[in-house]
Amino acid sequence: MRIYHYTSIQTLALILKSQKIRFNRLDRVDDMEESIYGSGPTQTKLGMYTFVSCWTKSCKENLALWNMYTRYKGVRIGIDEMPFVTHRVNDRFVSLLASPMSFGPDYMISSFVNEAKLFDMEYVDDPQAEIQKLIHRAGTDGIVVDIPHVGCFKRKEWEIQQESRFKLTVHPVNMTGAAEELLTKESPQAFNVLMKLFESLGPSMASNRPISTTHIDLDLDPVKLADVEIMLGPLTSEADRIIVEALLRPFPNATICDSVFNGKLRDKG
């Protein structure tokens, strides 16, 4: 099965050159409701710590998506339903990430909680109520996050998008304790440094500690990318076609096709 992503020709060029897909932070997507509400007793805004790549499973052309993301002049990328390089964690869990634990400038990300899975959006009457349920107390000052459902709720009016998503979850960390361990000890122990970082995870998320990273890029599987299908938008020009054909030259098995609406929509400028 293929999945589909509507985007600009410029973005297609970046994807083909880098052979990566960009996951954008949830508090920067078009639907502000996905990130403005807090979750659980801590009222944590999980959109700061969730990164998404948005697709649709529907092979039927969606005029709303053509308009929203390309103004009818971009492309629709069609690719295998699992387009990324994946990494097996155990017999039951396959991750989008290779490393059990890696660090950004102010966050930690782990293969253990980032499943290689395409999550279907749930369209609901009250997204705020659903988002509120995503965090529960654990012990005195700990929290448990329902990670599989984070970033999966939108208001019913968005249902026209028929959206599915890949997701990445990061954990904010306070580097202060680790830095003190490194700077104040003559022979700092790696274990102690890591413990300082781990100790900061729960409090950092509960206090809505901001992170600076706005996107994360993940490698596409080159075998899947080689078989990519590109549909030209209804209002693309002959010059646009020439550009797309040039971009796909390194991918001889890729295919180009026209929108069923080609020549059937009026360009209003």
Give the predicted meaning of each segment.
Residues 1-269:
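Catalytic-core loop-and-flanking beta/alpha module that positions acidic residues
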